[in-house]
Amino acid sequence: MTNIRKSHPLIKIVNSSFIDLPTPSSISSWWNFGSLLGICLALQILTGLFLAMHYTSDTSTAFNSVAHICRDVNYGWMLRYLHANGASMFFICLYLHVGRGLYYGSYMFKETWNMGVILLFAVMATAFMGYVLPWGQMSFWGATVITNLLSAIPYIGTDLVEWIWGGFSVDKATLTRFFAFHFLLPFIIAALVMVHLLFLHETGSNNPTGIPSDMDMIPFHPYHTIKDILGLFMMILALLSLVLFTPDLLGDPDNYSPANPLNTPPHIKPEWYFLFAYAILRSIPNKLGGVLALILSILILIIIPLLHTSKQRSMIFRPLSQCSFWLLTADLLALTWIGGQPVEHPYIIIGQLASILYFLIIIVIMPLAGLMENHLLKW
């Protein structure tokens, strides 16, 4: 008799995706982040669902409803901090996942890579709208500043901003629609994840060497499931440590003050995971130029497969490319730091230099390093 997991119409899809999936035997722990991201998404949807049961998306009650969740709802504080810090874990895993793709040349699977970039945009949009919901000072002013950037679009900009706001300023209509979209988008993200996996399973996984591994495959279960569970435990340990010991470590103290349109905080900044893009935005004096640089800082990932010049796929045997990769990593950390600093003398110039370097590394230095390594191979 045929095993039910291989014959049942539904179970066989799960079987071919997560159990009998042929996987390269050499993939390292850097390949764990896909499964961790799936778990992060599930955690965010679950905690978000329970939070939505108690939250009210009205400007007069939103802030108090969040306080009510923390004080009066059973384990409401834990739900709230799991959701807020779960978003941070989500972005840590996302950035490591993208970094792994860059380092090992996984971007050569163009459909999977492009789907991943779309997913990154969707997650960023969801996180931004979620940050507005507690209706604290930073929520309100963050929403005002970021949505206002669209007014830089020629001709239709102002109308577009007022259309998004649902009025002449960030108000009740804005909060209600942001809550609606924040609730809806994770389910769209879950559907996009299915497409991402569909494209991935068309080609099979890449591996650290970057060479085809068709002759050396092992089943996903039990080998990689065990490895993924280790990563899961480590992530849960980190998340629970954050939630139970320092839940506000990554938040902004200003968000504990109710939103006040008449009082601007001294330094408006987004959550830490957007600071690198925010620093790039601020480093350009022109509004439209800043908005374009902000969008391009993420959209540039789309053209990375076109900028691949090396004969080798992975960076594992390419020292020059490795140097440029770690320079990019350091540059992103510098941008993240700058994004959190006030706009004054040393920080402005550091931010501008780091922004130029960011685009320079991706567009010029990395392709040149690949070409140089090709020549070195001939020696």
From Swiss-Prot:
Keywords: Electron transport, Heme, Iron, Membrane, Metal-binding, Mitochondrion, Mitochondrion inner membrane, Respiratory chain, Transmembrane, Transmembrane helix, Transport, Ubiquinone. Its cofactor is heme b. Heme b b566 binds at residues 97, 196. The cytochrome bc1 complex contains 11 subunits: 3 respiratory subunits (MT-CYB, CYC1 and UQCRFS1), 2 core proteins (UQCRC1 and UQCRC2) and 6 low-molecular weight proteins (UQCRH/QCR6, UQCRB/QCR7, UQCRQ/QCR8, UQCR10/QCR9, UQCR11/QCR10 and a cleavage product of UQCRFS1). This cytochrome bc1 complex then forms a dimer. This is Cytochrome b. Changing residue 16 to N: In strain: Isolate MR-M981. PANTHER family: CYTOCHROME B. The chain crosses the membrane at residues 33-53, 77-98, 113-133, 178-198, 226-246, 288-308, 320-340, 347-367. Belongs to the cytochrome b family. Heme b b562 binds at residues 83, 182. A ubiquinone binds at residue 201. Gene3D superfamilies: Cytochrome Bc1 Complex, Chain C. Component of the ubiquinol-cytochrome c reductase complex (complex III or cytochrome b-c1 complex) that is part of the mitochondrial respiratory chain. The b-c1 complex mediates electron transfer from ubiquinol to cytochrome c. Contributes to the generation of a proton gradient across the mitochondrial membrane that is then used for ATP synthesis. CDD domains: cytochrome_b_C, Cytochrome_b_N. It is a multi-pass membrane protein. It is found in: Mitochondrion inner membrane. Heme 1 (or BL or b562) is low-potential and absorbs at about 562 nm, and heme 2 (or BH or b566) is high-potential and absorbs at about 566 nm. The lineage of its organism: Eukaryota, Metazoa, Chordata, Craniata, Vertebrata. GO terms for cellular component: mitochondrial inner membrane; respiratory chain complex III. Binds 2 heme b groups non-covalently. Signal peptide: none annotated. One of its GO terms (molecular function) is metal ion binding.
